[in-house]
Amino acid sequence: MKILFWGTPAYAVPTLDTLHEAGHQIVGVVTQPDRRRGRGKQLMPSPVKARAQELGCPVFTPERIRRDLDCQQQLNALDADVSVVVAFGQILPKDILQHPPLGCWNGHGSLLPRWRGAGPIQWSILEGDPETGVGIMAMEEGLDTGPVLLEQRLSINLLENAHQLGERLSRLSADLMLQAMPVIEAAGPGLEAERWSRLQVRHQPEEGTYARMLSKEDFQLNWGDSALTIHRKVMGLYPGAVTVWKDRRLKVLATEPLIERLADDLSDEARALVGRWNTGAHPPGQVLHSADSGLVVSTHGCPILIREAQLEGKARSHGQALIQQLQAQPGDSLGLAAKP
């Protein structure tokens, strides 16, 4: 089939690669414009643009596709059979959604209608969801409200961060989208109601859970929260959760909540530390112990093990290297919050 592909981050690249390798004709790739990134703030293409150029695909980079009528006309003139959208980052206008005869299909990283909108991977971890997945959804004007053609679930591991979960979902999204293409092609064009019947889609309820945009305040750790809440924030917002260590910003990159009921899901090193400190006996944020695997810190309830972190101006470190870098001693305290 002739496919118009829409995507921006590295998460979308496996789907582009998979469709290209399967022999589908990628008639165009639409992605966000180049942005300044990194310490040098150099103008850099999106991961999807970089890969599309390697594949020799025509690339389009509208700043605002809803306002760019010239770009809309160029894209519609490509006469794609179908549009495939994976984490593009802009809302598509009605004319773009309705132009391909076989529709616009989105690979969404959640179990719809839970976590519609941006950041479904982060929010599934932040809220402690036991599982998530990918849905191949027909796009309509509502935000992630369209009927779902294919869906696959996977469990979320306690010690899995958003990047790791995103990599698994990215591969799953690519596989499901490839499975969806012959089904969509076989159903053919036609009236919407007839197509949905032929495709046997699952219609979503009107009500759903929306993933709100994250703010800077969301990334600040509060040691007065429970160990599990702090851990979910560290893993869900990886690598952005921050606190203060001796007036310097500290990124906390990996933790384990030292909670007895979760012991089976912890590492051997963390499991050996469970139950060694009285719950609530120390002020939040106080260093309780320097272990080979990192720092044990008090919270509201059970303590938490910081396995990996990055002090402002330093390289990331873990275990004993982290303790040496911070020169941490029992009784030292982490700040309640820091500017991200």
UniProtKB/Swiss-Prot annotation:
Molecular functions per Gene Ontology: methionyl-tRNA formyltransferase activity
Residues holding (6S)-5,6,7,8-tetrahydrofolate: S110, L111, L112, P113
InterPro entries the UniProt entry points to: Fmt, Formyl_trans_C, Formyl_transf_N, Formyl_transf_N_sf, Formyl_transferase-like_C_sf, Met-tRNA-FMT_C, Met-tRNA-FMT_N
The UniProt record lists the keyword Kinase: no
CDD domains noted in UniProt: FMT_core_Met-tRNA-FMT_N (cd08646), Met_tRNA_FMT_C (cd08704)
Keyword terms: Protein biosynthesis, Transferase
GO cellular component, one term: cytosol
Pfam families: Formyl_trans_C, Formyl_trans_N
E.C. number: 2.1.2.9
Record field: catalytic activity: L-methionyl-tRNA(fMet) + (6R)-10-formyltetrahydrofolate = N-formyl-L-methionyl-tRNA(fMet) + (6S)-5,6,7,8-tetrahydrofolate + H(+)
Superkingdom assignment: Bacteria
SUPFAM superfamilies: FMT C-terminal domain-like, Formyltransferase
PANTHER family xrefs: METHIONYL-TRNA FORMYLTRANSFERASE, METHIONYL-TRNA FORMYLTRANSFERASE, MITOCHONDRIAL
Family: Belongs to the Fmt family.
Function in brief: Attaches a formyl group to the free amino group of methionyl-tRNA(fMet). The formyl group appears to play a dual role in the initiator identity of N-formylmethionyl-tRNA by promoting its recognition by IF2 and preventing the misappropriation of this tRNA by the elongation apparatus.
Designated name of the protein: Methionyl-tRNA formyltransferase
The species this protein was found in: Synechococcus sp. (strain WH7803)
Gene: fmt
